[in-house]
Amino acid sequence: MEIFPAIDLKEGRCVRLYQGEFSKETVMNEDPVAQAIIFEKLGAEILHIVDLDGAIAGESLNFLVIEKICKAVRIPVQVGGGIRSLKAVEKLLSVGVEKVILGTAALYDKSFLEEAVHLYKEKIIVGIDAKNGFVATRGWLDLSEISYISLAKQMESLGVQTIVFTDISKDGTLAGPNFEQLTLLQKSVGIRLIASGGVASIQDVKKLNDMNIYGVIIGKALYEKKIDLEEVLQVTKLC
């Protein structure tokens, strides 16, 4: 199982939100580059970065920070948030980003998604963020009428190989992942699933591992030391 330490960027800082609400932010580190280096030194094998400002604006507003992180660490970096054109995808890949996560664009611009998947194959990941079972977009501000299961099936049919699934109600709560929704998703599609939102303990990670979930994104639990990164990496290697 892959462990993805999370770095959420807002106004150039590393922050955490509560249930996706931008008014409920906590600054975890004023220097995201330093935070990335910390995670790498603790043994992280890949980083998950979200440009929160970009998710709302529809374009990367923390690009320079992302570029600095890519230059500062030797491990792969995957990035999401506001990536809605091929030019934006290419720009990120050109500075060393390993994989790009498309969210809003996956729902509203299928032709762009298809072209991106055709050109970049497994480097394109789709992020499905759900609230009460329905897909949320534009930085979680808009709620669509499409279920997360329906969108996941569409993405699989278009050749997407990996999905990041986030239950917004769990994000930043340390209340545990939404195992029920993840189980339904797993039964509905046959592609890689990365779980995000609510992970609070090594027990949560073990349960996801037992479910054969491909990866898990961990944010608040690492920053608040509910989970020790070195320990969870060791545990997942032994499983």
Swiss-Prot record:
GO molecular function, one term: 1-(5-phosphoribosyl)-5-[(5-phosphoribosylamino)methylideneamino]imidazole-4-carboxamide isomerase activity
EC number, as in UniProt: 5.3.1.16
Any one of the GO CC terms: cytoplasm
Cross-referenced Pfam families: His_biosynth (PF00977)
Assigned keywords, A-Z: Amino-acid biosynthesis, Cytoplasm, Histidine biosynthesis, Isomerase
Protein family according to the UniProt entry: Belongs to the HisA/HisF family.
Record-given protein name: 1-(5-phosphoribosyl)-5-[(5-phosphoribosylamino)methylideneamino] imidazole-4-carboxamide isomerase
Gene name tied to this protein: hisA
Naturally occurring in which organism (per UniProt): Bacillus cereus (strain G9842)
